[in-house]
Curated annotation (Swiss-Prot):
Binds 1 zinc ion per subunit. Catalyzes the attachment of alanine to tRNA(Ala) in a two-step reaction: alanine is first activated by ATP to form Ala-AMP and then transferred to the acceptor end of tRNA(Ala). Incorrectly charged aminoacyl-tRNA(Ala) is also edited in situ by the editing domain. It comes from Archaeoglobus fulgidus (strain ATCC 49558 / DSM 4304 / JCM 9628 / NBRC 100126 / VC-16). One of its GO terms (cellular component) is cytoplasm. Zn(2+) binds at residues 600, 604, 703, 707. It is found in: Cytoplasm. GO terms for molecular function: alanine-tRNA ligase activity; aminoacyl-tRNA deacylase activity; ATP binding; identical protein binding; tRNA binding; zinc ion binding. Signal peptide: none annotated. This is Alanine--tRNA ligase. The keyword Transferase does not apply. Its cofactor is Zn(2+). Belongs to the class-II aminoacyl-tRNA synthetase family.
Length: 906
């Protein structure tokens, strides 16, 4: 069936008076029950007609509209599903939930797992940052929006419903809300994404697209017989109803306000205006008319940058009868107000659902939104904190979040301080860049933000002030977000076997304490020995592999490594190998197995303790379980205090002392998600319909590792080290069981050794060390004082030996000193008005310092020295320092200095 046939096959439309027409403006087909309609009604073909003229029979608030929609589909046999987090924990390819169908990808849509209900309805908060730069400007764009949806998952021989029923539901819903059939347009717009495609109808009312009805029945294939957007597709066995109804757009259409922002969070908009430098009343009739006209024209003009934006503003100004300057005095501040209102709602969902701001991954997107909001607040001279607006959104929405508002507030306060530090440092950084480059390109601005966190507007402003050629690139924030919106694929090393083998029966799943077993050799390839069944654990999930022996025919074969490839366990055997068909006895090193088990179970206990002490935003970011220690990386916005670390360790050991049972079972994926939530996926997302769920005390995770039978078998847990390994990620290094005892014994040995060296009892070590430290600081101060005295004396001696150039003292010397002494001496000489260079031999290199107490730039002189002596450096105008390969003597230095002074004279 061709795409045209797919649309013509929707008999509901023809049976209910809808006629298929082609729009003369865009050339696309649409369906209408209005015999007079010739244009599709979709901007830019036609402007909004609902602004000032609501299309529903009554105005709705967000919660009212959401409930109305969900109830509508519940009454028609759909199971109501609770919203998923905006942080897509169940996905390995994307960070944020971008559509309601994303909740059910990849396992439900591929048919691997059943849907939580079929059919189902949901109102899913989604975050899309593709149009970040358009938010506030067009009147319709949002970073966070709720996609109300109903889905039906159809399988061969089991159809729930398809195109006719879907269009009928949409028409009935709109009719109930007060929209006449003649006012509904269904525009044909084939959909494609993520390797799938299908026919799609966009529901348009009053010029506003309120719903998208996708009929996903195609999969990408090079020999497919249907082409959509340049790719070829073929029919797939499963076919899915994938709809999206914009909650905010429904509310906007019901109110007919100038912008969507005025409809969905007017209280936040008013609060920002009342506490900012905005000097006009949003409810003023002239202001409302200007904003309404801007929204209408923005709808038909598309991208609003540069000349198109100027055209929009001139058109609106002419229509309303004001100057462009007067119009911009209203529109530009309002765009910032609307953007800030939108962004703070998005931040609430990001942080509330557990994102921790950082410089990488999903945390990058949270920080991007926060810093953009802080910049907007500065420009508006906002007399409130971002948290005040976030809290307002929470009250309006009434949603419950995993992360309490107190934690959200703490994160925002920390981010504000970090932003201020970045801005203060960034100013000089941009100035230095402008000194080197007279024109800043888009890539320069992206680099300044990505590497240094400097807001684009700030960089553009500073560069322009310094006379550089620069302009604000279009959609730069959207591009920044896009670069970081998808998780990087980790390239795993693929093991290729010559033959095919059945999946190994993995005995360690059922009994991790099993240390001996019987098996048969079914393959030998190189160093790999393949058995039909095995209790040897392969390296996986951050847990090191088992080691041990295979015993056969009186021989002993050492297993030094264990790997897995496509479900087949590969035993790396050192030396000779048992032959295929041999019956073997596997013997696992019990010490290695138990240490790994204790460390793995302890990892779960530690994670639980971290979440209890630090909060629900804590999420596993990596883990490693080895023989002598383990590590756990978690998301957190600052390094925990010593008191918090002590509390975490104490709680973990209480969990261990409580000797709670450790249980594991294979569960249906959807059932496990429903029962335990997405915290299951702390250690990653395992594939398949069924997943192994491990419960360690009060911690529950999808996990394929080996574990103790109870928390008591862990023995004890000792935190060895806590450090921040990157912004927003904290690493806990720890040991459990015997490894913990060994770690404590090593600490005690070091204490005894330190006590012996200082000749005091261990209990007196802190005071003794403190006393020595204070004495050392006093001596250090005295040394620094003496160095200054020496530098002064040395400077006087060198000034007496100085040459003269145009009545200036020129100093050039090779001295015996370290870099710190060189710099101090150079500062003294510069203070005395001298110009020159000092060199000193270092380990494997030569230190060089240039100085100028005159109009000349020491950095430029350093570059000249560097050309001759092969090196480089940097510094201030009065003193610069670096390293070179060649040690110049006094005469050689003077030659360079005199040449430099002559060239720069006047």
């Amino acid at each position: 069936m061709t795409l045209d046939e797919e649309y013509l096959d929707i008999t509901f439309l023809t049976e209910n008076g809808f006629v298929r027409k082609r729009c003369p403006k865009c050339g696309k087909h649409f369906w209408t029950a209005d015999p007079e309609r010739e244009i599709c009604g979709d901007p830019p073909c036609e402007s909004y007609s609902f602004i000032g003229n609501p299309v529903f029979k009554k105005p709705f608030e967000l919660d009212e509209m959401r409930e109305y929609y969900l109830n509508f589909f519940e009454r028609r046999g759909h199971g109501r599903i609770e919203r998923y987090p905006v942080v897509a924990r169940w996905r390995t390819d994307i960070y944020l939930t971008i559509a309601s169908i994303a909740d059910f990808q990849p396992f439900v849509t591929s048919g691997v797992a059943p849907p939580p209900a079929n059919p189902l309805t949901i109102s899913q908060p989604c975050i899309r940052l593709d149009d970040l730069d358009s938010v506030g400007r067009t009147g319709r764009h949002l970073t966070l929006f709720e996609m109300m949806a109903h889905h039906a998952f159809n399988y061969p021989g089991k159809e729930i419903y398809w195109k006719n029923e879907t269009v009928a539901y949409c028409t009935e819903l709109l009719n109930e809300l007060g929209v006449k059939k003649e006012d509904i347009v269904y525009k044909e717009e084939p959909w494609a994404g993520g390797g799938n495609a299908g026919p799609c109808l966009e529901a348009i009312v009053g010029g506003l697209e309120v719903a998208t009805l996708v009929f996903m029945n195609l999969e990408e294939h090079p020999e497919g017989d249907i082409e959509i957007k340049g790719a070829r597709y073929r029919k797939m066995d499963n076919y899915i109803v994938d709809t999206g109804y914009g909650l905010e757009r429904f509310v906007w259409a019901s109110k007919g306000t100038p912008t969507v922002y005025d409809a969905i969070f007017p209280e936040v908009v008013d609060t920002i205006i009342d506490n900012s430098n905005v000097s006009f009343n949003r409810e003023d009739e002239r202001v409302r008319r200007i904003v309404a006209e801007s929204s209408k024209l923005a709808g038909i003009m598309g991208e609003l940058r540069g000349e198109r934006l100027n055209q929009l503003r001139k058109s609106v100004a002419d229509t309303v009868g004001v100057s462009v300057e007067e119009l911009e005095g209203i529109v530009v501040p309002l765009e910032k107000v609307y953007s800030l209102a939108d962004h703070t709602r998005c931040i609430l969902f990001m942080l509330g659902d557990g994102l921790v701001p950082s410089n990488a991954g999903a945390g990058y997107l949270a920080r991007l939104m926060i810093r953009r909001s802080l910049r907007l607040a500065e420009e508006l001279e906002l007399g409130l904190d971002l948290y005040d607006l976030v809290e307002m959104h929470k009250k309006i929405l009434g949603f419950e979040f995993d992360v309490p508002l107190s934690t959200v507030q703490e994160i925002l306060e920390l981010e504000k301080e970090r932003y201020r530090t970045t801005v203060s440092k960034g100013t000089r950084l941009v100035e230095r860049l402008v000194e080197r480059k007279k024109k800043l390109e888009k890539d320069d601005l992206i680099e300044l933000y990505d590497s240094h966190g400097i807001p684009v507007e700030l960089a553009v402003g500073i560069a322009a002030e310094k006379g550089a050629e620069v302009e604000m690139p279009k959609d730069i924030y959207a591009e920044l977000a896009k670069r970081h919106s998808k998780a990087e694929k980790v390239q795993e090393k693929k093991i290729t076997l010559q033959n095919e083998y059945p999946a190994t029966e993995k005995l360690y799943y059922d009994d991790p304490t099993l240390l001996e077993f019987e098996a048969e050799v079914i393959g030998v390839e190189g160093d790999f020995v393949i058995l039909n069944r095995s209790a040897f654990y392969p390296e996986s999930g951050g847990q090191d592999n088992d080691v041990g022996y295979l015993i056969a025919n009186g021989g002993k074969f050492e297993v030094v490594d264990v790997l897995e490839a496509d479900g087949v366990v590969l035993h790396v055997v050192k030396g000779a190998k048992p032959e295929v068909g041999t019956k073997v006895k596997g013997v696992i090193d019990s010490d290695v197995r138990w240490r790994h088990m204790r460390h793995h179970s302890a990892t779960h206990v530690l994670l639980y303790s971290l979440q209890k002490v630090l909060g629900n935003h804590v999420w596993q970011a990596g883990a490693r379980k080895e023989f002598s220690k383990a590590r756990l990386d978690v998301t957190h916005f600052r390094r925990p205090s010593e008191e918090e670390i002590k509390e975490i360790e104490m709680l973990a050991n209480r969990e261990i002392l409580a000797n709670k049972p450790i249980k594991w079972e294979w569960m249906d994926r959807i059932e496990a998600e429903r029962k335990f939530g997405f915290r299951l996926y702390q250690g990653g997302v395992p594939p398949g319909r069924k997943i192994r769920v491990v419960q360690v005390g009060d911690d529950v995770q999808a996990c394929g590792g080996t574990h103790c039978r109870s928390t008591g078998e862990i023995g004890m847990l000792k935190i060895l080290k806590v450090e921040s390994i990157q912004d927003g990620v904290i690493r806990f290094e720890f040991a459990a069981g015997e490894a913990a005892i060994e770690a404590v014994e090593e600490m005690e040995r070091l204490l005894r050794e330190a006590s012996s060296i200082l000749r005091v009892e261990p209990a007196k070590l802190p005071k003794t060390v403190e006393r020595f430290f204070e004495e050392w600081k006093d001596q250090r101060k005295e040394i620094e004082r003496l160095k200054s005295v020496i530098a002064d004396l040395w400077a006087d001696i060198l000034m007496e030996r100085a040459e003269e150039f145009d009545s200036m003292k020129v100093v050039a010397e090779v001295v015996d000193a370290d870099m710190q002494a060189l710099q101090k001496l150079a500062e003294r000489l510069a203070e005395k008005g001298a110009v020159g260079c000092l060199m000193a031999k270092g380990e494997g290199k030569v230190f060089v310092v240039t100085f100028s107490g005159q109009k000349y730039d020491a950095r430029e002189l350093l570059r000249e020295i560097g050309r001759v002596a092969k090196g480089s450096g940097g510094g201030r105008k009065d003193v610069a320092q670096g390293a070179v390969q060649q040690l110049l003597d006094r005469e050689e230095m003077l030659d360079v200095i005199f040449r430099f002074l002559s060239e720069h004279e006047g």
